[in-house]
């Protein structure tokens, strides 16, 4: 059989001319809702030596099984996840990620995509999904089309059934974009910039002005250090970088980090955030700086 979920049973005794035999094939449907098609291969001393049987059908999942495997409720469309993490993709590279859904209604639905960022192609398959069957959403990302280095957060708006375009649901999307340095030659590496910061831990005092300075240096021997991006995912911090966006060899540049007091944790917990510095340093393209603050 083509998978462990399909079990054939048969008599191994030789079959005389004109005689018949029974082959029983069972499909284990537990935890596998939706359409299935499995192959069973019969090998014998015949011509041709191999025959193929197909077992197919649709498994209508029990409510508890559907709720466990597709817990996200998009109306008639049940999704396996409420967000899609595309992971890391390099510039000049592409990547595909898939997630599954299930038609939990009693009618055929035709899911469509009402919105996706320009750098992402989202395709539902199949176009029409009968009741009790699954669909696949493919996410195709081109690293050159994503606008920012590092983390990019966006969303995709799904219409579960094109006959009701007013019903829409949102899937959160994230992708982490970096430069591909895998083909940098030794001669270029010797002249490459080298990024360094004066500290990878910054504590902002609450009784001051709420600012800190991170000093970025280029310790390389040739090329300028290009600042691809400096950012934080914390709403309690703001960062600003030099307008030139580059640091010559042997020079430094200041990155200003400001605390947004009104965005600090309301329960009094200390701030523990990260600032990411992305450059064209092929050895250390990303430097992570921890920023803390404890304000009563």
Predicted regions and their residues:
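Long, low-complexity ectodomains and other extracytoplasmic segments of secretory-pathway proteins
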Residues: 45-102, 161-221, 281-296
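Short, hydrophobic beta-strand segments
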Residues: 23-31, 137-145, 255-263
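Short, solvent-exposed loop/turn segments enriched in Ser/Thr/Gly
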Residues: 30-39, 91-98, 144-157, 168, ...
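Surface-exposed binding patches on compact interaction domains or structured appendages
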Residues: 1-20, 105-134, 221-256
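Acidic, serine/threonine- and glycine-rich low-complexity intrinsically disordered segments
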Residues: 112, 121-123, 130-138, 143-184, ...
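Beta-strand-rich extracellular modules
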Residues: 28, 43-47, 142, 159-163, ...
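C-terminal soluble interaction/assembly domains
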Residues: 212-219, 224-233, 238-280, 284-294
């Amino acid at each position: 059989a083509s998978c462990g979920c399909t079990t054939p049973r048969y008599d191994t005794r030789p079959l005389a001319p004109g005689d018949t035999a029974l082959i029983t094939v069972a499909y284990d449907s537990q935890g596998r809702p939706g359409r299935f098609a499995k192959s069973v291969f019969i090998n014998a001393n015949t011509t041709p030596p191999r025959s193929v049987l197909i077992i197919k059908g649709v498994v209508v999942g029990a409510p508890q099984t559907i709720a466990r495997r597709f817990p996200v409720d998009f109306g008639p469309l049940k999704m396996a996840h409420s967000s899609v993490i595309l992971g890391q993709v390099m510039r000049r590279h592409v990547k595909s990620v898939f997630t599954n859904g299930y038609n939990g209604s009693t009618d055929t639905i035709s899911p469509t995509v009402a919105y996706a960022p320009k750098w992402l192609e989202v395709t539902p398959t199949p176009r029409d999904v009968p009741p009790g069957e699954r669909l696949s959403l493919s996410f195709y990302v081109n690293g050159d089309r994503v606008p920012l280095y590092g983390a990019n957060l966006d969303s995709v708006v799904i219409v579960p059934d094109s006959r009701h375009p007013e019903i829409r649901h949102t899937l959160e999307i994230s992708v982490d974009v970096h430069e591909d340095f895998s083909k940098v030659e030794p001669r270029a590496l010797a002249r490459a910039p080298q990024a360094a910061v004066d500290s990878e831990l910054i504590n902002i005092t609450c009784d001051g002005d709420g600012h800190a300075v991170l000093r970025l240096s280029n310790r390389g021997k040739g090329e300028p250090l290009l600042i691809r991006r400096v950012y934080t995912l914390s709403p309690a911090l703001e960062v600003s970088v030099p307008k030139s966006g580059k640091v010559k060899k042997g020079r430094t540049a200041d990155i200003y980090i400001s605390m947004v007091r009104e965005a600090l944790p309301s329960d009094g917990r200390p701030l523990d955030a990260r600032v990411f510095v992305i450059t064209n340093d092929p050895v250390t393209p990303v430097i992570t700086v921890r920023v803390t603050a404890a304000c009563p």
